């Protein structure tokens, strides 16, 4: 039997999908602004 693919890790989650990472690139900033416009409670991980 194979292991589960999702092994939760808060640090890895933040490093790959976090707010600081999103703000680094133009595309990432676009994601944040779209989520702000939509009224999301959480903008990033």
Swiss-Prot record:
One of its GO terms (molecular function) is structural constituent of ribosome. The keyword Ribonucleoprotein applies. Keywords: Ribonucleoprotein, Ribosomal protein. One of its GO terms (biological process) is translation. It holds the Pfam family Ribosomal_L34. InterPro entries: Ribosomal_bL34, Ribosomal_bL34_CS. One of its GO terms (cellular component) is ribosome. Belongs to the bacterial ribosomal protein bL34 family. This is Large ribosomal subunit protein bL34. It comes from Salinispora tropica (strain ATCC BAA-916 / DSM 44818 / JCM 13857 / NBRC 105044 / CNB-440).
């Amino acid at each position: 039997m194979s292991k589960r693919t999702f092994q939760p890790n808060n640090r890895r989650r933040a490093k790959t999908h976090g707010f600081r990472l999103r703000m680094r690139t133009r595309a990432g900033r676009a994601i944040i602004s779209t989520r702000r416009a939509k009224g999301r409670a959480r903008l990033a991980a």
